[in-house]
Amino acid sequence: MKGLNRIEGKLFIDEVSLEDLAKEYGTPVYVYSGSKLKENLNGYLSSVREEDKVCYSVKSNSNIHLLELLADLGSGFDVVSGNELRKCLEAGAKPEDIVFSGVGKTEEELVLAIKENIFSINIESEEELDRIIKTAKDLEKKAQCMIRINPDISSESHPYIQTGLKTSKFGILREGIDSLVEKASKSGLINLKGIASHVGSQIFNKELIFENLNLLIEIANNLIRQGHALSYIDLGGGLGISYQEEKELKPRAVLEEVISKLEPLNLNLLLEPGRSISGNTGVLLSKIEYLKKTSDLNFAVIDSGMNDFLRPSLYQAWHNISVVETINQKELSYEVVGPVCESGDTFGEDRILSLNEDSILAIHDAGAYGHVMSSNYNSRLRPPEILVEGKEIKVIRRRETFDDLLRQERDV
């Protein structure tokens, strides 16, 4: 993982030993590099124009301390719930730098978004448009909106993270766009700023991005010819990170070409990157509980479970696994598994590792879709989160306690 260094056999994040962090704060524990997070965001901010917007996808990692850090650097935010919106406002984000995506926005969430006058509510269906119009009328306030297009394009990634196919729940199919825009315009309650699309996550093929962009440009030009004053194209997010030696697309190389296509049309760009900002900033540290040998396999049973980090179980996702301190021990093939009472509670199969029962493991690239997807399954306590920058260490979420686990059940 980028941002990790091995010094005299010990693994470091920034200038801090992961072994020392595990000993100080216990395991499992998430650890993030603040310097890597800043570097990733700046890779986007330095590649766009002043009027363009980079809106970090909050769902990838929504810890408020990270949101504050990103807001201070000038990031906008892409939210998919009312509470994500509230978190961003609490973190100091400007409403004009927030977009609200997602297919199931409640009336309460729409009231909040319209009252706060956020940059855009991205409309996902005619039924949602009807609700937005009604809410705006009740509030006597215009809603700022873009229309999300379903481009029917595959992101060539896991089916669960493809969002641009015709069969997905997201966005408006092309044949429904004109009538939807006409309804929005006639209402007098919608300020239509542009059109949006998001193909999906883990994109490594640049052609998919430009297939989507060219479709959006064609649709935007058609709407502009009809008299609609659009100013933005929201291209979504989706640039992939390298979990297993995939060749990453660099923001600058992609965005220079994107902007060159938008400039002649006087259209601004909005992006919603998530994983490519937070993904490679974090590790999940876990200690060995048992080294179990059967006639066929060696199991490394660790103290992290699928409740702590779901991606390997849910998506069969590959994450590199390293020992935080190298030891003089024979390398063996291990099945790295957790303690949860599910056969799917696995983190890696046939991993070649040199281990003993005191070893601490680092599961790499766990900064996105890690803690945010954790749960209390098996009545397990969710882990803490630590932010490291240089030599500075900050606890940004404490470890849950048994009292925390009971509180919502007892205090009723």
Predicted features by range, described:
Residues 2, 152-291, 347, 353, ...:
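Active-site loop/helix belt of alpha/beta enzymes
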Residues 257, 266-412:
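Charged (often Lys/Glu-rich) extended helix/loop segments that serve as interaction or gating elements
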Residues 17, 33-36, 40, 44, ...:
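General structural feature for long, well-ordered alpha-helical segments within catalytic domains
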Residues 57-63, 80-83, 103-105, 124-126, ...:
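Active-site beta-loop-alpha junctions enriched in small/polar residues
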Residues 76, 99, 120-122, 146-148, ...:
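Structured core elements
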